Amino acid sequence: MALEVLMLLAVLIWTGAENLHVKISCSLDWLMVSVIPVAESRNLYIFADELHLGMGCPANRIHTYVYEFIYLVRDCGIRTRVVSEETLLFQTELYFTPRNIDHDPQEIHLECSTSRKSVWLTPVSTENEIKLDPSPFIADFQTTAEELGLLSSSPNLL
């Protein structure tokens, strides 16, 4: 997982494509789309090869009840827009091309936004925080020459 926090933008119900459930999440580096392949409207199972992300990217994690498309944001034709100084918007499409010729191909537009600020790099303290007194156990700690010798490597022992 990237250092950036994953931000869930939306849980979408794709009514045009057999009521597939689609979830999208993203970070500064990655975009992840999860699809539950059971169409509720007709009790139809959608196969992994009937779906692709953006410019032909297949599901790269296939489980019985979820397909995951996990790609770098620079892959698959994923587009990046700068919304503000702190926010990026990623845009792509998920395509459904059914094996059954009685169903029309479908396209869903997906968007996900994330913050440019990493939670790992955000300061958690301020200059107004409470300062603790130094520990009395370390304050008068003195090492002897013998202790220092034990901590260093001796050329005679090598």
Curated annotation (Swiss-Prot):
Highly expressed in oocytes. Residues 1-17 form the signal peptide. Its main location: secreted. GO terms for cellular component: cytoplasm; extracellular region. Keywords: Cytoplasm, Secreted, Signal. It is found in: Secreted; Cytoplasm. GO terms for biological process: oocyte maturation. It comes from the Eukaryota. The keyword Secreted applies. The keyword Metal-binding does not apply. InterPro entries: PLAC1_fam. Belongs to the PLAC1 family. Involved in oocyte maturation. This is Oocyte-secreted protein 2.
